[in-house]
């Protein structure tokens, strides 16, 4: 059985991520989407929220599971019996970074095989960080997000704006 892990922070999951998940689910018998913690990215959603959002977005893909973990991806792969690490590449910068990560993973576990998927042209410019930046400045990014995640993002940004206004009002008193 071909089992793969697709790790990422997915904050938020984009249509580019979802496309990779669909393509991976067609290639592998089982695909585990691993929602990782990366506090340096200043997460908009909690890990639990991201897991729930992704589960909803992939609900039609029977061979896809959504899990969360901390620590080394190769350790996760060993725990769940995965032989393949799935990664998406948007550009040469991604390739250089992912090549180095793949080499380190292979050093840590010589059974870890990284499989690269090239992003489709319509998704090559996307990143969760860019989408958060655009939407926080008032831009409409709904064309790049699954519907459930677009709604969650709108709600979260509205909550943050209301909190900011409340703090500003308290300072003005």
Swiss-Prot record:
State what this protein does: Reversibly transfers an adenylyl group from ATP to 4'-phosphopantetheine, yielding dephospho-CoA (dPCoA) and pyrophosphate.
Coiled-coil parts of chain: none
Q: In which pathway does it act?
A: Cofactor biosynthesis; coenzyme A biosynthesis; CoA from (R)-pantothenate: step 4/5
Q: Which family does it belong to?
A: Belongs to the bacterial CoaD family.
**What is the name attached to this protein's record?**
Phosphopantetheine adenylyltransferase
Residues under site feature: Transition state stabilizer: 17
User: What cofactor does this one take?
Assistant: Mg(2+)
State any single GO MF term. pantetheine-phosphate adenylyltransferase activity
Residues annotated as binding substrate: 9, 41, 73, 87
Q: Which residues bind ATP?
A: 9-10, 17, 88-90, 98, 123-129
Its BP terms in the Gene Ontology are: coenzyme A biosynthetic process
* Presence of keyword S-adenosyl-L-methionine: no
Instruction: Supply the SUPFAM superfamilies for this chain.
Output: Nucleotidylyl transferase (SSF52374)
User: What is this enzyme's class at the first EC digit?
Assistant: transferase
GO cellular component terms listed in the entry, alphabetical order: cytoplasm
């Amino acid at each position: 059985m071909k089992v793969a892990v697709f790790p990422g922070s997915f904050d938020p999951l984009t249509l580019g991520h979802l496309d990779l998940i669909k393509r991976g689910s067609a290639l592998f018998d089982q695909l585990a989407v691993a929602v990782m913690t990366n506090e340096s990215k200043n997460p908009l959603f909690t890990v639990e929220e991201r897991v729930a959002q992704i589960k909803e977005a992939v609900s039609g893909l029977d061979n896809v599971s959504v899990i969360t973990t901390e620590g080394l991806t190769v350790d996760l792969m060993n725990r769940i019996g995965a032989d393949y690490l799935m990664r998406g590449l948007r550009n040469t910068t991604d390739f250089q970074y992912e090549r180095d990560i793949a080499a380190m993973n292979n050093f840590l576990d010589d059974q870890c095989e990284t499989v690269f998927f090239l992003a489709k042209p319509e998704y090559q410019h996307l990143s969760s960080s860019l989408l958060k930046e655009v939407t926080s400045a008032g831009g409409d990014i709904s064309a790049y997000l699954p519907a459930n995640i677009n709604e969650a993002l709108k709600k979260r940004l509205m909550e943050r704006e209301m909190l900011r206004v409340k703090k500003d009002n308290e300072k003005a008193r």
